[in-house]
From Swiss-Prot:
A motif (HXXXXD motif) lies at residues 310-315. The keyword Lipid metabolism applies. It comes from Arabidopsis thaliana. This is Probable glycerol-3-phosphate acyltransferase 8. The HXXXXD motif is essential for acyltransferase activity and may constitute the binding site for the phosphate moiety of the glycerol-3-phosphate. It is an enzyme of class 2 (transferase). The keyword Lipid biosynthesis applies. Pfam families: Acyltransferase, HAD_RAM2_N. It is found in: Membrane.
């Protein structure tokens, strides 16, 4: 490979013909991704690994970043983004956000024509000015990349926190990208080079063929199904991609949204459930109820066991509102404060199978009971594996399909403080909830009446709920979710130890 090879004019990606290519070196922002700006992803790191205040500081610094980028150097502009977003953060928190938050937003921004070229190559290398720690998980797990050549951030070895500065040779732009390709490939030139700006010409000139990825209105993103892995789990409070405009709107709405969420929570708290359905609409919360709602149990008979898929912590409350009466629910983890503020009785499970079964049978003797056998929430259109314990408790099983829409904030979290979940949900300008009551399980599909095994009943309930919602049923569990998003097994003790 000749380091003296001059830069040249490269043809557009549309002229790249199908062929056998062993290796490729491609830029990320504006090349494999539709957007040329990495600001939204730095904003996500600043907010989700840091705080809303850090995100605000980053947003206010954007004019200075743009001026530095355009009139001083590309390197300086990116260095400012890195310093404000990363300085003082634990490297573990940055890694978790890169694995749990960023992939969902990156996945929605993958450019179709460049990814199709990238995907056909055997050896795939991404060369980017972004910090490696920020993009490596997505590139390898979802784009199928083999290596990421990017900017390395400096970490204080004593505290394991990012200093905000970068390691030598600095931010990977221009000639530094060329040197990184030389070091990675040696004398064997990459077959293809893809870039979107003139500063990419340095490394593209080393490739046997190079193509420019121009910003065009006709450019489209690929369906998420085309990625190497599906995105089932993700974390983070921000529901929409924080472009500068979205970020400004979010911060302007934040104080009003917080006040509105307090009103929405505490105004409805003392009201009877049969009235709350109407006050929700008054306060901008859209509630849709479908299906036949069973009447309360007769004295001396067991209550109905309402089996729900789990979208947010509000699921049991929405069912109580739909029924127009108080019903008890069981939950896997709940704070004392949340128990005090809950408008319906809530009982924490012990995770001891025999103890939990005995407690739930006692609750059913007193009346109706709500349970979410997935054990944790799932934001995407998937259902996790249903724990079969509920099928052993009663034959009076009523499946309920739950769904909700959140435009600005997510009302669930893995790494954050769960107490704030309902408040973030109600901070959305126009949140909506849907509850669809299905027919009670026929006797032949129960354990006692039909001779089915608990697992068969659980799988059947998962299937009928999934069919109504159009969700895919999976074998994934709470443990799978927390291992991916939080780096622990999902047990309360493990979660607390991780946060220390």
């Amino acid at each position: 490979m000749s380091p003296e090879k001059k830069s040249q004019n490269f043809p557009p990606i549309t002229e790249c013909r199908d062929g056998e290519y062993d290796s490729i070196a491609a830029d990320l922002d504006g090349t494999l991704l539709l957007s040329r700006s990495s600001f939204p992803y730095f904003m996500l790191v600043a907010v989700e690994a840091g705080s809303l205040l850090r995100g605000l500081i980053l947003l206010l610094s954007l004019p200075f970043v743009i001026i530095s980028y355009l009139f001083v150097s590309e390197s300086l502009g990116i260095q400012i983004l890195i310093f404000i977003s990363f300085a003082g953060l634990k490297i573990r928190d940055i890694e978790l956000v890169s694995r749990a938050v960023l992939p969902r937003f990156y996945a929605a921004d993958v450019r179709k024509d460049s990814f199709e070229v990238f995907d056909k190559c055997k050896r795939k290398v991404v060369v980017t000015a972004n910090p490696i720690v920020m993009v490596e998980a997505f590139v390898k797990d979802y784009l199928g990349g083999d290596k990421v050549l990017g900017t390395e951030i400096e970490v204080n070895p004593k505290t394991n926190r990012a200093t905000g500065f970068v390691k030598k040779p600095g931010v990977l732009v221009g000639d530094l990208k060329r040197l990184a390709i030389l070091k990675e490939f040696g004398n064997e030139s990459p077959d293809l080079g893809l870039g979107d700006r003139t500063s990419d010409h340095d490394f593209m000139s080393l490739c046997k063929k190079g193509y420019m990825v121009h910003a065009t209105k006709s450019a489209t993103t690929i369906p998420k199904e085309r990625l190497k892995n599906r995105i089932v789990f993700h974390d983070g409070r921000l529901a929409q991609r924080p472009t500068p405009l979205n970020a400004i709107i979010t911060y302007l709405w934040l104080p009003f949204g917080f006040i509105l969420s307090i009103i929405r929570v505490y105004f409805n708290l003392p009201l009877p459930e049969r009235f709350v359905r109407y006050t929700y609409e008054m306060l901008g919360i859209h509630l849709t109820i479908r299906g036949h709602r069973p009447p309360p149990p007769s004295p001396g008979t067991l209550g109905n066991l309402y089996v729900l898929n789990h979208r947010t912590a509000l699921d049991p409350i929405i069912v109580a509102i739909a029924l127009g009466r108080k019903i008890c629910c069981v939950t896997y983890s709940v704070s004392r404060l949340s128990l005090m503020l809950s408008p319906i009785p809530a009982v924490a499970l012990t995770r001891d199978r025999a103890t939990d079964a005995a407690n739930m049978r006692k609750l059913l003797e007193k009346g109706d009971l709500v349970i979410c056998p997935e054990g944790t929430t799932c934001r995407e259109e998937y259902l996790l594996r249903f724990s079969a314990l509920f099928a052993e408790l009663s034959d009076r099983i009523v499946p309920v399909a739950m769904n909700c829409k959140q435009g600005m904030f997510n009302g669930t979290t893995v790494r954050g403080v769960k107490f704030w979940d309902p408040y973030f949900f109600f901070m959305n300008p126009r949140p909506s909830y849907e509850a669809t009551f299905l027919d009670r399980l026929p006797e032949e599909m129960t354990v006692n009446g039909g001779g089915k095994t608990p697992i068969e009943v659980a799988n059947y309930v998962q299937k009928v709920i999934g069919a109504v919602l159009g969700f895919e049923c999976t074998e994934l569990t709470r443990k799978d979710k927390y291992l991916l998003l939080g780096g622990n097994d999902g047990k309360v003790e493990s979660i607390n130890n991780t946060k220390k």
